[in-house]
């Protein structure tokens, strides 16, 4: 089972990963070069 430190690290990593994924998706969808 996870302790608080592992859970906090995982939540932080997941949040950063989703943030980068959303930014990358926005750039790909907004840029007409990628089709």
Swiss-Prot record:
The chain crosses the membrane at residues 9-29. Coiled coil: none annotated. The keyword Transcription regulation does not apply. It is found in: Endoplasmic reticulum membrane. Keywords: Endoplasmic reticulum, Membrane, Signal-anchor, Transmembrane, Transmembrane helix. Residues 30-35 are cytoplasmic. InterPro entries: Oligosaccaryltransferase (IPR018943), OST4_plant (IPR044165), Ost4p_sf (IPR036330). Residues 1-8 are lumenal. It is a single-pass type III membrane protein. GO terms for cellular component: endoplasmic reticulum membrane. Pfam families: Ost4. Its main location: endoplasmic reticulum. Component of the oligosaccharyltransferase (OST) complex. Subunit of the oligosaccharyl transferase (OST) complex that catalyzes the initial transfer of a defined glycan (Glc(3)Man(9)GlcNAc(2) in eukaryotes) from the lipid carrier dolichol-pyrophosphate to an asparagine residue within an Asn-X-Ser/Thr consensus motif in nascent polypeptide chains, the first step in protein N-glycosylation. N-glycosylation occurs cotranslationally and the complex associates with the Sec61 complex at the channel-forming translocon complex that mediates protein translocation across the endoplasmic reticulum (ER). All subunits are required for a maximal enzyme activity. Belongs to the OST4 family. This is Dolichyl-diphosphooligosaccharide--protein glycosyltransferase subunit 4C. It comes from Arabidopsis thaliana (Mouse-ear cress).
């Amino acid at each position: 089972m996870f302790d608080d430190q592992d859970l906090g690290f995982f939540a932080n990593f997941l949040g950063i990963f989703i943030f980068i994924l959303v930014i990358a998706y926005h750039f790909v969808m907004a840029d007409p070069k990628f089709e």
